[in-house]
Amino acid sequence: MSMNDDIKTVLVSEEQLKAKVAELGARISKDYEGKNLVLVSILKGSVVFMADLMRAVTIPCNIDFMVVSSYGGSNTVTSGLVKIIKDLDGDLSGKDVLIVEDILDTGVTLSKLVPMLKMCNPNSVKICTILDKPSRRKADIQPDYEGFQVPDEFVVGYGLDYDEKYRNLPYVGVLKPEIYTK
């Protein structure tokens, strides 16, 4: 059985993703020209977007990675508690930080993470997300760079998973409810 069989509908195609990443890369390159840009990928979900975005950014930049969780295992609901599993390797002092996220959902994780990063004395901290789900927002946080707004559906692909599956789909799709309500 193919992973595609578990998808109810494709929300964002591979072609749409490629075009949007190129557009975001061009905007970020222009906005951060002459600055000391650090792209901070929030793993695991943003790894695919990060790999594509960093190649679309045409100015020098550093990259770093964090593993942060407010979900557990196959849970589909945030716990509201943010746990740093892997912290940054580099120093953010005096740098312009752009958090690279797969999806901005409730905003709880980022609303706690942004102030933590600001304590590292960067010049700025902004957010870039490929997907935004504003209908589920619980925290007062908005992306500075946004790819696509998506409805309140369980989405997978392009780095997003359910129980560590579907990350490698080249598109963003809605998972059939029977898959995650078993």
What are these regions (language model features)?
Residues 1-182:
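PRPP-associated nucleotide enzymes
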